[in-house]
Swiss-Prot record:
Disulfide bonds join C40-C54, C47-C60, C51-C87, C53-C72, C62-C70. Its main location: secreted. It comes from Agelena orientalis. The keyword Secreted applies. GO terms for cellular component: extracellular region. The presence of a 'disulfide through disulfide knot' structurally defines this protein as a knottin. Belongs to the neurotoxin 37 family. This is U9-agatoxin-Ao1a. It is found in: Secreted. Expressed by the venom gland.
């Protein structure tokens, strides 16, 4: 019976320690400077979501369900459309200027 109480006590202490650790982690993340939260990630670097990747056509790719890690890669115009709906930061969507389907090449004569 004492062994059961000791195990229950250790479980309670472990649970409380995890709660405190999670609270400290969330308060640390809230204290991160706003510039660091808004900074975008260049292609080839590790990411956690599409809105972190710089450029309107770049997105966060996680091959093999993230087993190899996730990184920003170049996408297409549909990535731009999706990011316009999901992402709130302007520095992610500002390069290159123009719409999602814009092209610098103009067709002449047709």
């Amino acid at each position: 019976m004492k062994l059961l109480l000791a195990i229950a006590g250790l479980f309670l202490v472990q649970t409380l320690a995890e709660d405190v650790r999670a609270h400290e982690e969330s308060s640390f993340l809230a204290a991160v400077a706003p510039e660091e939260q808004r900074a975008c990630i260049k292609e080839g670097e590790k990411c956690a979501g599409d809105c972190q990747c710089c450029g309107k056509w770049s997105y966060c790719s996680c091959p093999l369900f993230g087993a190899l890690g996730c990184s920003c890669i170049i996408g297409d115009a549909m990535v731009c459309v999706r990011k316009k709906k999901e992402c709130r930061t302007s520095d992610v969507m500002n390069t290159p200027p123009g719409g999602c389907f814009s092209s610098s090449k103009r067709r002449h004569g047709r």
